[in-house]
A protein has these predicted regions:
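Short glycine- and basic-residue-enriched patches
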Residues: 110
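N-terminal regions that are enriched for targeting/export leaders
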Residues: 1-4
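Glycine-rich N-terminal segment of FAD-binding domains in flavoprotein oxidoreductases
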Residues: 7-102
Length: 110
């Protein structure tokens, strides 16, 4: 599969794995010596590019929300846009937001 980053350069060929669960992800990680996790690929450099990629986009579930504290537990592939859509109407906002809402929680942490 051809992949690139925010700037659309470089474009590389990569083997992209897309697990839908933590168990699937563990199997992929155990079977590959060199891989990189990737969300939306919105980084400015090449840090989301590698010959072997594990995409977190299917791991996109919000698992828990504490309405008293605003604490969210979610999988790495949850997009900021989904968090904002779900929690701004409830009176909550993320304490830090980037210039785009098209990133994943995992990418923001990375």
């Amino acid at each position: 599969m051809k992949v690139t980053n925010w700037g659309n350069y470089p474009v590389i060929d990569a083997a992209v794995h897309s697990p839908a669960s933590f168990d699937e992800m563990k199997k992929i990680v155990a079977s590959s010596s060199e891989l990189i996790a990737r969300g939306m690929g919105r980084c400015y450099g090449d840090s989301s590019l590698n010959a072997t990629i594990i995409s977190t986009l299917r791991m996109d579930h919000i698992l828990a929300f504490d309405d008293a504290t605003g604490s969210i537990t979610c999988e790495a592939g949850v997009r900021f846009s989904e968090l904002l859509d779900a929690f701004v109407p409830r009176g909550w906002f993320l304490p830090v937001t980037p210039g785009t809402k098209f990133i994943t929680v995992g990418g923001a942490i990375a």
